[in-house]
Amino acid sequence: MYTLIKLTSEYTSRAISFTSRNFVASEPTSIALKLTTCDFTTSFQNIMKQCVDYGHSFAFVDADDNIKAQILNIPYDAYENMHYGNIRETDPMFDLFGNLDSYTPDDKCLYVFAIGSEVTGKGLATKLLKKTIEESSSHGFKYIYGDCTNIISQNMFEKHGFETVGSVKYKGYQYGITKPFDSINCTEYIKRMVKTI
């Protein structure tokens, strides 16, 4: 049995650990770059903390209060001004995501930074996305968007009314003289996906 909660400051360290662990194990760009949990945490701990602090993030916890699935959300204006821990291991990722910046929202927007689940077959990630959609509307957001890096999240977002507004193909993507994402075979593109509320 899993309980849906709104993430609060008492969960910050667990939320950061969960996302770092989940992404280096299953997120295509993190795997392609061979990121460690330390690399991921160093680069993204500030935004993960802010996602919890802003109060728009949710999780499912088990009976022992361990996070089993979560979604980290942040208002776009805060996301846009975020400072990251710059390490060379994540530079190609920032470069790739930067190529999606041709789309920026023109009204109050909530950004889905991360969604993940350690539990399969229970629909926990889908329930978290639905909760985000419901909550964003009640807080006056006009849009929700996320940068979806794998086919599973892309299909889930599309099923819930998100449209692709930008994409970059992994194969052949060049960072300097390297092609760091050529090893990604599970998904063809990274997609920026947007839902109008």
Curated annotation (Swiss-Prot):
Its EC number is 2.3.1.57. InterPro entries: Acyl_CoA_acyltransferase (IPR016181), GNAT_dom (IPR000182). The active site is at E27. It catalyses: spermine + acetyl-CoA = N(1)-acetylspermine + CoA + H(+); spermidine + acetyl-CoA = N(1)-acetylspermidine + CoA + H(+); spermidine + acetyl-CoA = N(8)-acetylspermidine + CoA + H(+); putrescine + acetyl-CoA = N-acetylputrescine + CoA + H(+). Acetyl-CoA binds at N22, I115, S117, G121, G123, A125, T126, T149, N150, K159. CDD domains: NAT_SF (cd04301). Keywords: Acyltransferase, Transferase. Residues 102-182 form the N-acetyltransferase domain. Pfam families: Acetyltransf_1. Gene3D superfamilies: 3.40.630.30. GO terms for molecular function: N-acetyltransferase activity. It comes from the Viruses. Belongs to the acetyltransferase family. Acetylates polyamines such as spermine, spermidine, cadaverine, homospermidine and putrescine (the latter with low efficiency). May play a role in the regulation of polyamine catabolism in the host during viral replication. This is Viral polyamine acetyltransferase.
